[in-house]
Curated annotation (Swiss-Prot):
It comes from Rhodopseudomonas palustris (strain BisB5). The lineage of its organism: Bacteria, Pseudomonadati, Pseudomonadota, Alphaproteobacteria, Hyphomicrobiales. This protein is one of the two subunits of integration host factor, a specific DNA-binding protein that functions in genetic recombination as well as in transcriptional and translational control. Residues 97-123 are annotated as: Disordered. This is Integration host factor subunit alpha. Heterodimer of an alpha and a beta chain. Keywords: DNA recombination, DNA-binding, Transcription, Transcription regulation, Translation regulation.
Length: 123
């Protein structure tokens, strides 16, 4: 399940459980489906699902607002609705930034400190 820009599917998750846990493919599939169903059921009830070191799934209520039809420019009321939000944990953010192309906060902060010390030594 490694690679960039690739979409991981249920089948991929089931295969990972099969490979790493040692359950049969049928049991792995049932396990993944059970976990996803439990998360879905909790979110339907408006509960927050917090997975330590991963993040939280939560449902937020959005109020009614006025939008615009992009074709006509006419104002259109947008009904209130519930939306699902994912908030990644600090640990997940660090792991993503450590493996990604963007510099981490600590390395960019140290680069700023290095620049300050270099300019101070020149004066």
């Amino acid at each position: 399940m490694t690679g960039t820009g690739r979409t991981v599917t249920r089948v991929d998750l089931c295969e990972a459980v099969y490979q790493k846990v040692g359950l049969s493919r049928t049991e792995s599939s049932a396990f993944v489906e059970l976990v996803l169903k439990e998360i879905t059921d909790c979110l339907e009830k408006g509960e927050t699902v917090k997975l330590s070191s991963f993040g939280s799934f939560l449902v937020r209520q959005k109020g009614q607002r006025i939008g615009r039809n992009p074709k006509t420019g006419t104002e259109v009321p947008i009904s209130p609705r519930r939306v699902m939000v994912f908030k990644p944990s600090a640990i997940l953010k660090q792991r993503i930034n450590a493996n990604g192309s963007a510099p981490s906060m600590s390395s960019s902060a140290s680069a700023v400190d290095d620049d300050k010390s270099e300019s101070a030594s020149r004066t």
